Amino acid sequence: LMVLALTMSSPTLLAGVVENYDFKENHTGYTLYFKQINDNEARLMQLNIDNYDTEIVIPSVVKDTYGYEFKVTAIGQLYNEKYNDKGIDFSYMGQCTSIFGNVSNCPNYIKSVAIPESVKTIWPLAFSGSLKDGYGLGCKSLTIPGNVTEIGAGAFKYAKFEQVAIP
């Protein structure tokens, strides 16, 4: 296990509205929105946080409203609908945007984000914030599993972590 200690500036976060999702999971303090990739896979496309003092666990498997299971293999949000899951250029940030909804300043930050072993790709700008607006994911710790084989450009741009663990 490799652990990186990062400097954290003033933490901030989000809460927002998402459209075009296929299914969602409500948890105490946060809601996860998913988009179906194919018959067996889904990606986390948005994370809305209601309680900033929480531990966010992204599941390895999600169910749709009919009970069908989908393995969560990606984290990311398309910039607009003209792009699709299969055509993502991981070196280019123009196709994607952050998984966070509307962002606002918050005096606290979330405890942790745990990404499951099922995730293989983290899209460009997935956990990014904005230097111009001064926001980014404020998080005490993030765990990135060893199964992640691709991390897109700017995936953690302007994010604020105290600790990142990469097994």
Language-model-derived ranges and their functions:
Residues D22-D50:
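GGW-centered surface loops in extracellular recognition modules
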